[in-house]
């Protein structure tokens, strides 16, 4: 990915909140243990509008030096919490916040990349995988015609 993402689970809604982080971002870090992700190198999140980057579908504020708006990615298929899915992402993240053993942050990062972004990339704007912009953000989500590809250049 072109930018590192900070993630935190909202257990009340089973929603994973993601936002780009970097040394140049002045946005407030997300509270809690999962928000305490060390900043990446200055080149990971550029100070300009990010229009040259390959992450299609993310609003331009994702790369703003003024601090990106929070992005909420939800995937009904991947975020289900059932007895038959004890290793679902919300369960893993909740156990980590309680200090219990769980899968590593590396696994969580891979999960996000492989399950959430890959689903969006392969399936396009699917009804069960949606992206919302929070915090009164006026930036619109712009997606190329299906399949929406986060990982190839425009």
Swiss-Prot record:
Record PTM: A fraction may be phosphorylated in insect cells and HepG2 cells, a human hepatoblastoma cell line. Phosphorylated in vitro by host protein kinase C or mitogen-activated protein kinase. N-acetylated in insect cells.
Pfam family, one: X
UniProt feature, compositional bias: Low complexity: 33-48
Region (Disordered): 28-50
InterPro entries: Transactivation_prot_X
Main location: host cell
Any one GO biological process: symbiont-mediated activation of host NF-kappaB cascade
GO terms for cellular component: host cell mitochondrion; host cell nucleus
Superkingdom as given in the UniProt entry: Viruses
Region (Mitochondrial targeting sequence): 68-117
Record's keyword terms, sorted: Activation of host NF-kappa-B by virus, Activator, Apoptosis, Host cytoplasm, Host G2/M cell cycle arrest by virus, Host mitochondrion, Host nucleus, Host-virus interaction, Modulation of host cell cycle by virus, Transcription, Transcription regulation
The keyword Transcription is assigned to this record: yes
Cellular location(s): Host cytoplasm; Host nucleus; Host mitochondrion
Family affiliation: Belongs to the orthohepadnavirus protein X family.
Subunit relationships: May form homodimer. May interact with host CEBPA, CFLAR, CREB1, DDB1, E4F1, HBXIP, HSPD1/HSP60, NFKBIA, POLR2E and SMAD4. Interacts with host SMC5-SMC6 complex and induces its degradation. Interacts with host TRPC4AP; leading to prevent ubiquitination of TRPC4AP. Interacts with host PLSCR1; this interaction promotes ubiquitination and degradation of HBx and impairs HBx-mediated cell proliferation.
Role this protein plays: Multifunctional protein that plays a role in silencing host antiviral defenses and promoting viral transcription. Does not seem to be essential for HBV infection. May be directly involved in development of cirrhosis and liver cancer (hepatocellular carcinoma). Most of cytosolic activities involve modulation of cytosolic calcium. The effect on apoptosis is controversial depending on the cell types in which the studies have been conducted. May induce apoptosis by localizing in mitochondria and causing loss of mitochondrial membrane potential.
Name recorded for this polypeptide: Protein X
Organism encoding this protein: Hepatitis B virus genotype F2 (isolate Brazil/w4B)
